[in-house]
Amino acid sequence: MSLPKVLILCQPFNNNFGGGITLANLFSGWDKNKIAVVCTSHIFNNLNTEVCDTYYVLGEEEHKWSFPFNYMQRKVVSGEVKVSNEGGAENPVATKITLRSKIVNNYFYPFLEYIGLFHGISKITLSEKLCKWIDEYNPDVIYAQAGVRETLVFCLLAESYIKKPMIFHVMDDWPSTISQKGPFKKYWHNKIDGELRAVLDKSEVLLSISDAMAQEYKKRYGKVFKTFHNPIEIDFWKSHQRNNYELGKTPTILYAGRIGTGIQATLESMAQAIDIVNKDLVNPVHFILQTNDKPAWVDKYSCVQHKALVPYADLPKVFAEADFLFLPYDFSEESIRYIKYSMPTKAPEYMVSGTPIIMFAPAETALVIEAIEGNWAKVVTENSIPKLAEAIKQLVLSENERKQIALNAVRIAEEKFNSETVRNNFRKVIAGIVKQ
């Protein structure tokens, strides 16, 4: 199959964010000369260069901030960057988040959102330099992701200029939560909804992250979405796939990934549940948190140990060495709106690892529905620490149940998320719209 030249908007290839991991796995094996990315400097880090090494960084010539916020931004040079392996595919561990970044992301931006300024203080334009670069690259097709207003509007601008078919891929239901606070929330919700619908109208193909999302978006937007979730390299994960379900003297439950919207409170709930379980068990259970930042509550619990993120290449071994993998979603209304139709990138990776999965999440989420249907996880759908503790205890005491849910998970992952099958279907979709 002859593969077209693709221009990717607003999402780099990386191994520390779901959108980047999914992107890398979907486009793996593509000719590097036929892939380029346009993105802001804010997400230009921890790059995976195995698939793509050509980037245009949206700097001060395109990324414009209103006064006085323009004085608070670092000066970034616009233009093409050729990325080497250093700091990319060979070292994809997340960079240390600075105190400045924490303050800006956790306090400053939420404050701006509340007072109604966040969605209007910056925009991305098409500079003469960027247009020239796009003309020289001359893509056949556009692939885009967006999660904030400025990137959404930029997708419209880019499609209008390039005049080539566009594929728009939605990773989670951010349209439902992008404007939920402050006196101007209705204004921004309606405005962004209109801009999103314009992007959907301009797109030749629409992609969702789950079947549940595709069904919901058909009702909400009247559009047909095809589902493409993160595929997995079966052989890569089989290199350390767990096949022994006996427990050691200190059983471990591992959570590896991000802490943020939709995944916060349930992590501490797990620590509290383990404290309850350990009162009844001879061999205490330990909770390993492998995250970028150490939560403030960790030191309150003797059962919890925080570890830094590891290179992506080490994950099969790390997952297989754990006795259980924890897959949580928070139960707040805001969290449910955000994650209801999502399928976390780590889900198929957890599944194929062979390690039993404990899921603590609302019953209405796509993730829980699929897990219950396939019986590939021990699922707790009530926001109850005692019930979570009871589920943990049941799994610790039942090797048969541990083995059954783990084998189900492996089988379904190999059938549904096999990268060879998913990638071939993805290529057919892209090649098909270029030929039209």
Task: Please give the residue ranges for each predicted region.
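A charged, aromatic-enriched C-terminal amphipathic alpha-helix characteristic of glycosyltransferases
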Residues: 383, 387, 397-430
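N-terminal subdomain of nucleotide-sugar transferases
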Residues: 1-87, 225, 233, 274-280
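Conserved catalytic-core segment of nucleotide-activated headgroup transferases in glycan assembly
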Residues: 233-239, 243-300, 305-313
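Conserved nucleotide-sugar donor-binding subdomain of glycosyltransferases
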Residues: 78-141
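Nucleotide-sugar-dependent
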Residues: 262-265, 313-317, 325-351, 357-369
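Membrane-proximal helix-turn-helix segments that form the acceptor-binding/catalytic region
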Residues: 25-26, 128-132, 150-153, 157-161, ...
